[in-house]
């Protein structure tokens, strides 16, 4: 299998999926669980926010603090659960790509690899966080030394001249103007972040597959081996991503639907119901659209990526697929 031949990868992926008896059942379970977890987390977060709004006074401070903490932890718990589920789903797609039997039970593998997956995710987060910080430190001096910052200087100079002993005081209108004037700096920082993060992203692209394929591997080893595997092939992986444009375009449409309650008023379209109803309405449509995209498209995409991984990994002695879990996880 040649990663440079995207058509060959896709055709082989279609053949593997056609022979996978449990392929549609796997994506059905994965999609339903993902959507159910997202829906429950959103509803619980809304209920918590309503309860927080009802608590007031010193007597309710403890309850309010507990509810606020629960609301803050909820997205973290959701992200960790979906992270494990995602890895388990990828393991089933890797089995299908290799012509091996796979079933929904295989999605438990992500939870079996929880600690190494968590460490790997945290390490990648630190790496990308460092990239973001570096891009910001580069973008701000560029912004300040170019005419892009003139509007900020025009806003700040009168404030500095009139500053008293208490320092510079900003009213809401001035603060809004300052944020608008800083927008070029944010755009410049974002562009630099993308330019710096893209090579890093493709460098560690195969780390999750290595965690699946090698039960004894650690987080650092997975990142290191991924870097070695993708060396010289990052452009080919990028080309493969571009060939999947239809999937990513569909996901962007679903995200736009999720923010429909905010986008439509910005376009001058007034919605005939309250903000809360509009939020949950568009969120429900977003979940439905996401389910359709996952159910009909996700398997094709992930089996193709699994084949790309197999085309890059060094040839090793066969072990009958034991690296993907025991018989009860297949």
Report residues per predicted region.
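Hydrophobic alpha-helical membrane segments
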Residues: 1-330
């Amino acid at each position: 299998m040649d990663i440079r031949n995207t058509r060959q990868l896709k055709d082989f992926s279609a053949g593997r999926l056609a022979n996978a008896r449990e392929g549609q059942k796997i994506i059905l379970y994965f999609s339903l669980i993902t959507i159910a977890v997202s829906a429950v987390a959103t509803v619980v977060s809304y209920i918590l926010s309503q309860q927080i709004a009802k608590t007031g006074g010193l007597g309710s401070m403890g309850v309010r603090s507990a509810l606020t903490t629960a609301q803050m932890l909820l997205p973290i718990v959701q992200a960790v659960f979906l992270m494990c589920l995602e890895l388990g789903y990828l393991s089933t797609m890797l089995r299908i790509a290799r012509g091996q039997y796979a079933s929904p039970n295989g999605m438990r593998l992500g939870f079996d690899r929880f600690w190494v997956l968590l460490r790997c995710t945290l390490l990648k987060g630190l790496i990308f966080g460092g990239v973001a910080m570096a891009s910001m430190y580069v973008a701000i001096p560029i912004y300040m030394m170019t005419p892009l910052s003139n509007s900020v200087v025009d806003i700040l100079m009168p404030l500095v001249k009139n500053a008293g002993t208490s320092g510079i005081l900003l009213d809401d209108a001035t603060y809004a103007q300052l944020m608008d004037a800083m927008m070029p700096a944010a755009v410049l920082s974002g562009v630099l972040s993308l330019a710096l993060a893209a090579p890093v992203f493709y460098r560690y692209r195969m780390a999750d597959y290595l965690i699946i394929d090698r039960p004894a591997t650690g987080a650092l080893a997975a990142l290191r081996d991924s870097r070695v595997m993708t060396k010289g092939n990052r452009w080919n992986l990028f080309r493969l991503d571009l060939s999947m444009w239809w999937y990513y375009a569909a996901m962007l449409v679903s995200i736009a639907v999720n923010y429909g309650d905010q986008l439509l008023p910005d376009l001058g379209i007034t919605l005939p119901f309250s903000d809360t109803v509009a939020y949950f309405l568009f969120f429900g449509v977003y979940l439905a659209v996401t389910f359709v995209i996952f159910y009909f498209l996700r398997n094709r995409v992930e089996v193709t990526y699994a084949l790309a991984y197999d085309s890059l990994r060094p040839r090793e002695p066969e072990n009958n697929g034991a690296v993907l879990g025991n018989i009860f996880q297949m």
